[in-house]
């Protein structure tokens, strides 16, 4: 079975060119994108650019290509080096992270733990968390390394945005603050709902990224499992005031440490900057207390103080904070409808909104709140919700800017039941297991199948075009024997990672239907048949 893929739809906008940022363990940190200029590049600059794009090595599957250009990870614990890389399947840039183990035997002692932890992290799927794509081990004679691929964030950190806002003598918008807090808490609630809970452990304004459209993403998690057994040593942490008081005092921290860090982020977002002690980056408790007193909204002040309780057990959970009066709002009918549309977008034609609104009377009443005691009726006209604004709102909901937090939040799949934050494991002498094939989870929204005769009565040629829910086209072809077992063929496509298991029965039905039509057409002196099935 051969395959070719193409990205048919580009993203609606590119991320802004912002300064570089530091990064948390395991997250894709940001290297400063080069600002374009009108002057022609010198031969030296062109040569340097070519050197940076040179491919140094590939992943075992051939999908990920490591470039020479390094990504600035600053002092990220556990990450020895990070490079820009290319995802050849989807045509996007990613980050190639490397963790060097000082000796091969050190990796052997940790192998089972490392695999269990990374298998968990790959399952994480949340719009407000930097995506963790893939990992594998590279074991040589006397050394070993673990390589993992993460999403590349071309936008800047929240810290940079806050600095720029303060530099321009602006204040923080309350609505923006609520929107950012909601997105961060939605991601933390997702991590903490795992069984066992996943603790981020390094949440600061430097490890939170903001895109041009207001989308917030927190850095993906780098497990402590790798931090104490790697070549690099943990250096003195900056931003110490973001770390809960119990850090270093107890062996096993809880999700409450993330709540403390979030509270400090929420405070910094509200006041733009917490003043440190002179040239030192150290922020004393007095400066934190002074910053809290600057908050005018008593609800906002109470919200942050709850997060910064010195006793971990007294801090609320991420889920509880989403319902705090400082943040919670009853979701509007517009937001509920938008989430319903986004959740069923594979069933709705792409131009449905345009078709519905093009012949609509804009002066007609869309919705009405009837009059009540001492209250005039309120009408909403179609003209108050232009199609372009609705399109943008749907795109924002689709991207995760307005998570629906009043209901049950999505929970991650957990294939392993291993604690992801504890580095303590018993030695293992098991041999490495072969790397499993990558499982396809994306839904196929359109299937097209064609069968043509190659050698009469001997073999046919099958062509499949699959359109996935993220607009990716997958083109597959193979020779088909007259006595081919169709269910086995569909099962093989699942096993090879071309389609998800959920689409196996649909594809089996499509193939059988097409083959029956082909045989009927062949008996009618025709030599090909085609059928299209759309979900």
Curated annotation (Swiss-Prot):
Residues 1-26 have a biased composition (Polar residues). The modification Phosphoserine is found at residue 2. Keywords: Acetylation, Cell projection, Cytoplasm, Membrane, Phosphoprotein. Residues 68-327 form the Protein kinase domain. Residues 27-42, 414-432 have a biased composition (Low complexity). The protein kinase domain is predicted to be catalytically inactive. Homodimer. Binds to MLF1, recruiting a serine kinase which phosphorylates both itself and MLF1. Phosphorylated MLF1 binds to YWHAZ and is retained in the cytoplasm. Interacts with ELOC/TCEB1, ELOB/TCEB2, TSC22D2 and TSC22D4. Interacts with the Elongin BC E3 ubiquitin ligase complex via its interaction with ELOB/TCEB2 and ELOC/TCEB1. Interacts with SALL4. This is Nuclear receptor-binding protein. It comes from Pongo abelii (Sumatran orangutan). The lineage of its organism: Eukaryota, Metazoa, Chordata, Craniata, Vertebrata.
């Amino acid at each position: 079975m051969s395959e070719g893929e193409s990205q048919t739809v580009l993203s609606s906008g590119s991320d802004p060119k912002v300064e570089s940022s530091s990064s948390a363990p395991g997250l894709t940190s940001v290297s400063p994108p080069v600002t374009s200029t009108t002057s022609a590049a010198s031969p030296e600059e062109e040569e340097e650019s070519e050197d940076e794009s040179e491919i140094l090595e590939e992943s075992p599957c051939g999908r990920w290509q490591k470039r020479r250009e390094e990504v600035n990870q600053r002092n990220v614990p556990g990450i020895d080096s990070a490079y820009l890389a290319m995802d050849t399947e989807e045509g996007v840039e990613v980050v190639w992270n490397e963790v060097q183990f000082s000796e091969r035997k050190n990796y052997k002692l940790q192998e089972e733990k490392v695999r269990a932890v990374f298998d968990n992290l790959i399952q994480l799927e949340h719009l407000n968390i930097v995506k963790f794509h893939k990992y594998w081990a590279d074991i040589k004679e006397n050394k070993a390394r673990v390589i993992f691929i993460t999403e590349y964030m071309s936008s800047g950190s929240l810290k940079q945005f806050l600095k720029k806002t303060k530099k321009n003598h602006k204040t923080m918008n309350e609505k923006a603050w609520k929107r950012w807090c909601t997105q961060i808490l939605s991601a933390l609630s997702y991590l903490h709902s795992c069984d066992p809970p996943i603790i981020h452990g390094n949440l600061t304004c430097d490890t939170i990224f903001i895109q041009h459209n207001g989308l917030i993403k927190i850095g993906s998690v780098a497990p402590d499992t790798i931090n104490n057994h790697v070549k690099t040593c943990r250096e003195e942490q900056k931003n110490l005031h973001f770390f809960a008081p119990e850090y270093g005092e107890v062996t096993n921290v809880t999700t409450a440490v993330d709540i403390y860090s979030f509270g400090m982020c929420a405070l910094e977002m509200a006041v733009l900057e917490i003043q440190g002690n002179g040239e030192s980056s150290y922020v004393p408790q007095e400066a934190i207390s002074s910053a809290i007193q600057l908050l005018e909204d008593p609800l906002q002040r109470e919200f942050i103080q709850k997060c910064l309780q010195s006793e971990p057990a007294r801090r609320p959970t991420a889920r509880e904070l989403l319902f705090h009066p400082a943040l919670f709002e009853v979701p509007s009918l517009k937001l509920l409808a938008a989430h319903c549309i986004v959740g069923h977008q594979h069933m709705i034609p792409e131009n449905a909104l345009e078709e519905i609104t093009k012949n609509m009377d804009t002066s007609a009443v869309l919705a009405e709140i009837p009059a009540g005691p001492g209250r005039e009726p309120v009408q909403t006209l179609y003209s108050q919700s232009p199609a372009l604004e609705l399109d943008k709102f749907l795109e924002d909901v689709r991207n995760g800017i307005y998570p629906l937090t009043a209901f049950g939040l999505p929970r991650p799949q957990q294939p392993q039941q291993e604690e992801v934050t504890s580095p303590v494991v018993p030695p293992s002498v098991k041999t490495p297991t072969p790397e499993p094939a990558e499982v396809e989870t994306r839904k196929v929204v359109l299937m097209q199948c064609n069968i043509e005769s190659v050698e009469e009565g001997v073999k046919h040629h099958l062509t499949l075009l699959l359109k996935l829910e993220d607009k990716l086209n997958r083109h597959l072809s193979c020779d088909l024997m007259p006595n081919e077992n169709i269910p086995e063929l569909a099962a093989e496509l699942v096993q090879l990672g071309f389609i998800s298991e959920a689409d196996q029965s649909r594809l089996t039905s499509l193939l059988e239907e097409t083959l029956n039509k082909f045989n009927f057409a062949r008996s009618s002196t025709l030599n090909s048949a085609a059928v299209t099935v759309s979900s």
